[in-house]
Amino acid sequence: MRAVIPYKKAGAKSRLSPVLSLEEREEFVELMLNQVIDSLRGAGIEKIDILSPSVYGLEDMTKARVLLDEDDLNEALNRYLAGSEEPVLIVMADLPLLAPAHIKGISSTEKDVCIVPGKGGGTNALFIKNPSRYRVKYYGSSFLTHCSIATDTGQNFEIYDSFLAGTDIDEPEDLVELLIHGKGPAKEYISRKFRLEVSRGRVGLVLL
């Protein structure tokens, strides 16, 4: 099997712009990417590809193979799947709470496809045993779409339900979960800029 991580550093994570500058966001996404790669390697996955529209931020990448594709996410991933002859694990790059144990659980499924739901109907990871028979369709309620694609193509699927694997970092409030549950460079980076504060029974961020 092999893993592929879609990644784009330039202008990353615009929804974090209320709390992080462009430079900070680009530094942060690079840290998250490297943590995802380390988790994959910790789970015993050696074949790791980064699928990106640009080499920006990947010039010195040695932990994974960089594949350039300027098409949109779905076209690039579907081209990748069509050319794959072994099981593929698609993992998003913004999952700093993802651990090797999650990856082992996802990839050990007995089903044809394993789908990891993200917040708001998204898809954080997809393990596909027969990639040439499957097509992805991200954006919108992609979790439901990916379940339907599996059914429509005659493939059974498992839903891997995990709070940590299901927590992608897109919004400022997601940084709260990273500070509470995370560890490693991504958490350390955010903890140098923010601390947690409880107000009116809710946990929020306060700038240091």
Curated annotation (Swiss-Prot):
GO molecular function, one term: phospholactate guanylyltransferase activity
Keyword Zinc-finger assigned: no
A GO BP annotation: F420-0 metabolic process
Short name of one Pfam family: CofC
Entry EC number(s): 2.7.7.68
Alphabetic keyword roster: GTP-binding, Nucleotide-binding, Nucleotidyltransferase, Transferase
Annotated pathway: Cofactor biosynthesis; coenzyme F420 biosynthesis
Catalysed reactions, as listed in the record: (2S)-2-phospholactate + GTP + H(+) = (2S)-lactyl-2-diphospho-5'-guanosine + diphosphate
Keyword flag Nucleotide-binding: yes
Matches recorded under SUPFAM superfamilies: Nucleotide-diphospho-sugar transferases
Name of the top EC class for this enzyme: transferase
Oligomer and partners: Homodimer.
Function: Guanylyltransferase that catalyzes the activation of (2S)-2-phospholactate (2-PL) as (2S)-lactyl-2-diphospho-5'-guanosine, via the condensation of 2-PL with GTP. It is involved in the biosynthesis of coenzyme F420, a hydride carrier cofactor.
Family, per entry: Belongs to the CofC family.
Annotated protein name in UniProt: 2-phospho-L-lactate guanylyltransferase
